[in-house]
Amino acid sequence: MDIERKWRDRWRDAGIFQADPDDREKIFLTVAYPYPSGAMHIGHGRTYTVPDVYARFKRMQGYNVLFPMAWHVTGAPVIGIARRIQRKDPWTLKIYREVHRVPEDELERFSDPEYIVEYFSREYRSVMEDMGYSIDWRREFKTTDPTYSRFIQWQIRKLRDLGLVRKGAHPVKYCPECENPVGDHDLLEGEGVAINQLTLLKFKLGDSYLVAATFRPETIYGATNLWLNPDEDYVRVETGGEEWIISRAAVDNLSHQKLDLKVSGDVNPGDLIGMCVENPVTGQEHPILPASFVDPEYATGVVFSVPAHAPADFIALEDLRTDHELLERYGLEDVVADIEPVNVIAVDGYGEFPAAEVIEKFGVRNQEDPRLEDATGELYKIEHARGVMSSHIPVYGGMKVSEAREVIADELKDQGLADEMYEFAERPVICRCGGRCVVRVMEDQWFMKYSDDAWKDLAHRCLDGMKIIPEEVRANFEYYIDWLNDWACSRRIGLGTRLPWDERWIIEPLTDSTIYMAYYTIAHRLREMDAGEMDDEFFDAIFLDDSGTFEDLREEFRYWYPLDWRLSAKDLIGNHLTFHIFHHSAIFPESGWPRGAVVFGMGLLEGNKMSSSKGNVILLRDAIEKHGADVVRLFLMSSAEPWQDFDWRESEVIGTRRRIEWFREFGERVSGILDGRPVLSEVTPAEPESFIGRWMMGQLNQRIREATRALESFQTRKAVQEALYLLKKDVDHYLKRVEGRVDDEVKSVLANVLHAWIRLMAPFIPYTAEEMWERYGGEGFVAEAPWPDFSDDAESRDVQVAEEMVQNTVRDIQEIMKILGSTPERVHIYTSPKWKWDVLRVAAEVGKLDMGSIMGRVSAEGIHDNMKEVAEFVRRIIRDLGKSEVTVIDEYSVLMDASDYIESEVGARVVIHSKPDYDPENKAVNAVPLKPAIYLE
């Protein structure tokens, strides 16, 4: 921890991460700024470490890198949290005491929502600094800052001027606790859950209506009965001049859509069982039957039954027919016996009652059978895609189901026989404040017109010009650009920016976080300016115009823009990341559109999903205190690629710590070999003559090359594999090969390895790298040192092949010794004769493994007199070598160079033969290129 504090202080004092325009090529990257309503956990750690590694890497490559940070405090969830804390809600207090570890004296101040975000903004910054993030903190801001609010008002006025903001009514996710619409960003549970529209069909019962919700209004012609749950509570409500009967649980949701809805009394559902209602379309009477499967919290708690086409209704009727106790209790024996399914949809391949057929097909036994859901899903899809209304249906007979559904629903609503409501596709949907969300139809609401076709075209053009990592999620962006409908962009309460033309409203969090990357470019320069003077002309002059005013601000913006990389989580593709594309494409010219996006996977903790609300998290501060920042960073970068889900496992984190300890120990080992600490600033390029020295430098070149290419595409796991794990394996092998040697070549090679390796690891473990860089005589900060060079045409291939041959030869000798069960006095190794290399060359030049073609060329060139031997060898080439690339090496020189090592590995004297001058058992004939023959004596 002392080392970490030391380097944080030095970085800060030197200001090395403060980025200002200069003559270098720039890199500008941002990651989603956090919503500081809780403590930072290890999932956040991965999110913010990826861009820091990339920023450090590009900085070392010589780029001018801007990596800023800010705090997204807009929204209502924090107000809900403050209210719950104010009223001493036990669950909320427990979470903030035990999970977020807020001291009691601080928690007492959490009844103020602004203090909550102030507290956690400080906490976040402190932890980010502890993690060693190379952030330009001069540009830090909160989304409630007056200057930022003026910027956001400029943005939304621009969009309104373009006709991309409208007013109207629209169903939205809504938190009654916060009294506000909510987006996915505001949710603890239910992110990405869609809002479905259902048709409400009114079945008359006396002076009231039982109102049943359905996705399939066209099946009203096949209704046979209604279902109620006799064990739940039902009520009478008044709305639109009518009296409806619905479940009590449905009131919470429906009252936010029918704003005049009032409860007028209780209804005992048991009293309704056996009574009949009137079908709003056919006028037929249908009995009300009991059903425990009816969920009172879904829609209205009233279901109409179509047993010919709904497998659940068919099987429910069958189950009821055999429940004699229930039938007797309500006197329903004759009623149920008389019910017959009514066909209303014709589908090729199915008979009169398709529901019965799919139940038999799937082997569904009763209502509890899990296969019922599969049967239902299959039939609904088939009838929607291929079904037509049966010919006996008035007016609509022969019409496609997919068309009839909408037409029938609209006509019934026009006649007052139906209505509509909205419901979540899945439940529960829980706000960050802990409140249960409903669907609310917002009147007098402001919307972003993402439905606008011309705007969608612009967004597609913007996306087409972007790099997307990983590329396979591009299809997700394309889908959401097409799928997005109008978006409620304002709220009644919460922290944030007032809508400039209607100050009753506050701009919601996703709308105010789409182009803030542009604000970063000038944020530090606006700090001392008067927000009141920042009108639209001010921001136009900076971001859009060529006028002479505010030239210094405009030049700073133009230096950094466009944004090179935007990084965020994959669950934000459907909103924030796609909104980011929409807004840039509308406001900025094409030259200012974003260039790339990187999408993150999610985080697991010991195999389970992380959740602050459920206490299943490890705070990042705790992980740093236990393991150190470098260990945390390295594990997060090496456990999975950024777009993959990662799993924090304590045992693997401990293993990561050991790798860093080994890295430090390597530095000390090199110091010992060099008879004192190396001076890295004085290291000159190694030029080894030995094959193993050339091999080590070739491997180092390869690891640098592959790590560099991986980092260019944000493949942090692959980069760590190359830069640490595989290079460590190479170094271990080299040290073993040169064991006992301390000559100048070994010293030079190891000094070069250490010099490159510290720089190679600096983006991942900056504290360790800085300490080692200083300890071993590096110049300045390693964070500013040049990234190690590599060459694409290095001689690494032939030395790699040479070393592989040495290792294979050692293994072959050891295998023979194991079979013989004894250690020989001498090991004779016979290299391949020149003619076999020539034949191999011919085979490669011929380009096809054809016996005749190869033999013809060999004969024509007179390579070898004994054509029988040639034929045997060619057959072996065809069998074993395939189309492998031919790399020619001097086997004799390589093996002679490695003879001491081979002797140490096999424990016997080694004799290398380039000719079979001593070959008592005629082994030399078995030698082929890269696979010497062996004789033990």
Curated annotation (Swiss-Prot):
A motif ('HIGH' region) lies at residues 34-44. It is found in: Cytoplasm. The keyword Cytoplasm applies. Keywords: Aminoacyl-tRNA synthetase, ATP-binding, Cytoplasm, Ligase, Nucleotide-binding, Protein biosynthesis. One of its GO terms (biological process) is leucyl-tRNA aminoacylation. The keyword Ligase applies. It is an enzyme of class 6 (ligase). Its main location: cytoplasm. It holds the Pfam family Anticodon_1. One of its GO terms (molecular function) is ATP binding. A motif ('KMSKS' region) lies at residues 609-613. GO terms for cellular component: cytoplasm. Its EC number is 6.1.1.4. It catalyses: tRNA(Leu) + L-leucine + ATP = L-leucyl-tRNA(Leu) + AMP + diphosphate. InterPro entries: aa-tRNA-synth_I_CS, aa-tRNA-synth_Ia, Leu-tRNA-lgase_arc, Leu-tRNA-synth_Ia_arc/euk, M/V/L/I-tRNA-synth_anticd-bd, Rossmann-like_a/b/a_fold, tRNAsynth_Ia_anticodon-bd, Val/Leu/Ile-tRNA-synth_edit. Belongs to the class-I aminoacyl-tRNA synthetase family. This is Leucine--tRNA ligase. It comes from Methanothermobacter thermautotrophicus (strain ATCC 29096 / DSM 1053 / JCM 10044 / NBRC 100330 / Delta H). The lineage of its organism: Archaea, Methanobacteriati, Methanobacteriota, Methanomada group, Methanobacteria.
